[in-house]
Amino acid sequence: MKFVLLFGVLLVTLFSYSSAEMLDDFDQADEDELLSLIEKEEARKDCIPKHHECTSNKHGCCGGHLFKYKCQCTTVVTQSGEETERCFCGTPPHHKAAELVVGFGKKIFG
């Protein structure tokens, strides 16, 4: 009887220790996921929206519906005759075509 009681106490101790370790692992994973989401949200706040100027930060455009916007540049001639480069965040034509196809696919199949 003493052996069964001792074995039961040992089993309960091991079970509680292992479950505490698992809970710590889950808590750590939750914290890591939360920090990752916060970092993504911060990056999203700092991004440049569609149709806004991205001349100084060409890789900082926000994400669109399916794809990230791309910084598209054009050369502009000022009134004084100087050529300057002006850039804006927008959707490239091949991304627009892909979004159109996906939209039709959703309407037909979805």
Swiss-Prot record:
Molecular function GO labels: toxin activity
Q: Where in the cell is it found?
A: Secreted
What are the residue ranges of the propeptide?
A: 21-44
Question: Which GO terms of the cellular component aspect does the record hold?
Answer: extracellular region
**Main location class:** secreted
**What cystine pairs are annotated?**
47-62, 54-71, 61-89, 73-87
Q: Does the keyword Repeat apply?
A: no
Could you tell me the keywords of this UniProt record? Disulfide bond, Knottin, Secreted, Signal, Toxin
Q: What parts of the sequence cross the membrane?
A: none
| Tissue expression per record | Expressed by the venom gland.
According to the UniProt entry, where is the signal peptide? 1-20
**Domain comment as written in the entry:** The presence of a 'disulfide through disulfide knot' structurally defines this protein as a knottin.
Q: Which family does it belong to?
A: Belongs to the neurotoxin 19 (CSTX) family. 03 subfamily.
This protein is called U1-lycotoxin-Ls1aa
Which organism is this entry from? Lycosa singoriensis
